[in-house]
Regions:
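Active-site catalytic microenvironments in core metabolic enzymes, especially phosphate/sugar-handling
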Residues: 220-223, 350
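Charged catalytic cores and adjacent phosphate/nucleic-acid-binding surfaces used
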Residues: 3-154, 160-174, 185-215, 227-380
Length: 380
């Protein structure tokens, strides 16, 4: 699952491609038919998206599926490796001694080359083929392994949901815990809370907790990292909280050294557990900050501070390639939704996708921990 896409490619296996093509071009929302062949068709959907449909016999479906789910770079490297084994590989299958061997199961594409099956998220030519040949691919994190959301905004700040509603929804998701993480006072535009308001919020959390004993409600803030690297709430208040996330919300365009030092100062704060949406990018709107990432990763590893993977679709931050790099330093991660509305809690799957593309497993993600392990980690 990539952050953004261009055209949409759909593949299918059928013994009657003509019937499928007819149904495809008549699908509700198709505003223009670009091409319509016997086994291929291209349409414009809803006057915006181009959708291509290609239909092959069932015995070629596996190789075609691999072709469309691998990036171009991955496929080039895979085909180059096949050539070293005197094989020619295409979306139709393998040519062996001039004869075509068709593949109807995608996993058999990799098995035929005597390598482990490579999950689609890893097919970016970042060393996955070498790892598959050595049987050293990581076991990737699954959505079902998430025990709770560590970054949810309530209507105490700029969220549009009550703490009770957050807790009920989290119970339905099967979570063991949920973290109420409102903005702090320095972010006035988001109705950030001061110390007095945070103590009032805690009373509501305690009341809701009594009504929901099966899930643990943890108290948190998303504290603002000021331009100086200082935090905008008193240390004594931070020490009362279960988890603290620190994020940059202002002064986005500092130079690389200044921004790096600013973030590292927050990482080193003894009460900060997580750095929220670390790069600051908003897809299609704002580029990432200028940051020396190796320095940030080293600081996180030294201070045992986690980096957030924001599952919010316009953020998806930290980006997958940086997750992969950070993992090599021993950095831990928290996959969070940054939910402000109830349906945002369902966005977790997008953060999981980023983590998987970043080669992350369950052991790399702190909100796969049990409640007791998470609390122990936060006390590190």
């Amino acid at each position: 699952m990539k952050e953004t896409i261009g055209d949409i490619d759909i593949i299918a296996a059928s013994s009657d491609p003509k019937e499928l093509i007819e149904a495809f071009v008549k699908f509700p929302g198709v505003s223009q038919i670009i091409t319509q062949g016997e086994a291929k068709s291209t349409v414009i959907y809803n006057q915006k998206a181009q959708i291509d449909l290609e239909i092959l016999p069932e015995n070629e479906y596996g190789s075609l599926l691999q072709h469309f789910t691998g990036s171009k770079e991955h496929n080039v490297t895979l085909r180059t490796y096949a050539q070293t084994k005197n094989l020619s590989f295409s979306e139709h299958g393998f040519k062996v001694g001039g004869k075509l061997k068709r593949i109807n199961n995608e996993k058999d594409v990799y098995g035929f080359l005597k390598m482990d099956w490579i999950p689609p998220e890893l097919r970016e030519d970042r060393g996955e083929i070498e790892a598959a040949l050595k049987h050293k691919l990581p076991k990737l994190v699954e959505l079902s392994e998430i025990k709770g959301d560590l970054h949810v905004h309530s209507n105490w700040s700029d969220g549009q949901i009550s703490i009770s509603d957050i807790v009920r929804a989290s119970e339905k998701l099967g979570y063991e815990y949920v973290v109420i993480s409102d903005h702090t006072v320095g972010l006035g535009i988001a109705h950030g809370l001061n110390e007095v308001e945070l103590e009032k919020r805690q009373k509501e959390i305690d009341t809701v907790q009594k009504a929901h004993p099966k899930i643990k409600i943890l108290s948190s803030v998303e504290v603002n990292i000021k331009a100086s690297g200082d935090l905008d709430i008193a240390d004594w208040m931070l020490k009362k909280l279960n988890i603290v996330t620190a994020s940059v919300h202002t002064s986005f365009f500092q130079d690389r050294e200044t921004m790096t030092n600013r973030i590292i100062k927050a990482i080193a704060h003894p009460d900060v557990d997580i750095i929220g949406h670390p790069s600051g990018r908003i897809i299609g709107q704002r580029e990432p900050y200028q940051v020396d990432w190796p320095k940030v990763f080293r600081a996180c590893a030294e201070n045992k501070t986690a980096l957030e993977i924001s599952a919010f679709p316009d953020r998806l931050d930290l980006m997958d390639f940086l997750c992969k790099d950070a993992k090599t330093y021993g950095v831990k991660f928290a996959i969070n939704t940054d939910a402000h509305q109830l349906h945002h809690l369902d966005l977790m799957r997008f953060g999981i996708s980023v983590a998987r593309r970043g080669w992350l497993g369950k052991e790399d993600i702190i909100n796969t921990y049990s409640l007791s392990d998470l609390i122990d980690w936060a006390k590190r």
